[in-house]
Amino acid sequence: MRFLFLHPNFPAQFWKISQALAANPRNEIVFLTAREDGSIAGVRKVLYKTAREVAAQTHPYLKTYEQAILHGQAAYRAMLEEKKRGFYPDVIYGHSGWGTTLFLRDLFPRARFLVNFEWFYNARGADSDFDPEDLPTADDEARLRIRNSSILVDLYSCDAGSCPTKWQHRQFPSEFHSKIEVLHEGIDTAYFKPAEPDAPLVLGKNGLNLSELPEIVTYATRGMEPYRGFPQFIEAVHRLLAARPNCHVVIAGEDRVAYGAALPDGKTYKQELLARFPLDPKRVHFTGLLPYADYLRLLQASHAHVYLTRPFVLSWSVLEAMSAGCLVVASRTAPVEEVLEHEHNGLLVDFFDVEALTATMNRALDERSALTGLREKARQTIQVHYELRDCLKRRVAWMNRQMK
């Protein structure tokens, strides 16, 4: 069979499924993307480039929609050339929201059209109005409604959709629920596993030897931002280090905003927070983005791993931490509660309660031996519900059903 995957950021959510399908020599796998670097054995990349940037005069509500249309237009043009060369997919599987999915149904009308749906924007009841000090304005509400435009086109156009979690599935309009199946991408538990006894845990990127640190709190994020509880975490770390002279904190991620709004004065949240809550650079280690092997060592060395999120998309990182046997201290928010139960396989705190977060990190460090069972149950949760092999089987079976 011929499969066409669509995502501007290769390989993104389609890494493992495209890799698995490419292992079958009877399949032909094409991946349309805007990202030049990276490769997967047996997967042929086709590149596209948008014709221009979003116009400065475009109405603010329409900027994300215009951006999606530009991606969709470029995707169509790139695949038109492939069609002229004889490529016609049996299955198209794209990620909604970016725009690459918008027009290819028209170019390949006989193909089964599958879409991965990650998030539907709502001004009420999820992330947007979660912070009482940062409620959406009328402009925000209007912008969010229009931001769903390209997603709604995909919901209408697709033959079937997938969504990684039940929480994320609930964000979509109820009339489309039957069209979307909950299918997580899966976690490689054979890779994300606890360290062997006495294994050296050195971050190759900067030579930091985690094996030598007596107490380690870890935090991993794409961006240092309010959506992932970075302000609460830094304030809690400020308090924690004052009480624990032997504690070290290792923070992986970039000093940028991945989700939500940046500060209006041009400062990063890291800059602002470190000015308010100074931290000892000898005990707080900002590693930047880590290579996969170093990221695994970070999780394996952790004595307490903190994951905070607004009611938004659930990060792979918390599932990877659970698979690696981390003692996870996380926010008591809906996406987290789908995978973590307080005192069963992790410890939950109120997202905004810095005092409770500090106390829970203290407890995690004080009671490391007593809380070993939570680590074991966290890994078991991933093995039972999110094991990569099982998730791939379910996804392939779902894709096969769409061909009937």
What are these regions (language model features)?
Residues W167, G186:
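Carbohydrate-associated surface elements
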Residues R52-L62, R110-S149, A190-L201, S211-E212, ...:
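Acceptor-binding helix/loop patch of EC 2.4 sugar-transfer enzymes
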Residues D159, R297-V313, C326:
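Acidic donor-binding loop of glycosyltransferase active sites
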Residues M1-R44:
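N-terminal subdomain of nucleotide-sugar transferases
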Residues A356, R363, A370-H385, C391-A397:
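A short, well-ordered alpha-helix in the C-terminal region of glycosyltransferases
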Residues R256-V257, A262-L289, A293:
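Nucleotide-activated donor-binding/catalytic signature segment of Leloir-type glycosyltransferases, i.e.
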Residues H342-E343, L347-V354, R363-R368:
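Conserved acidic donor-binding segment of nucleotide-sugar-dependent glycosyltransferases
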Residues S162, L203-R228, I234-R239, V249-V250:
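Conserved donor-binding/catalytic core segment of Leloir-type glycosyltransferases
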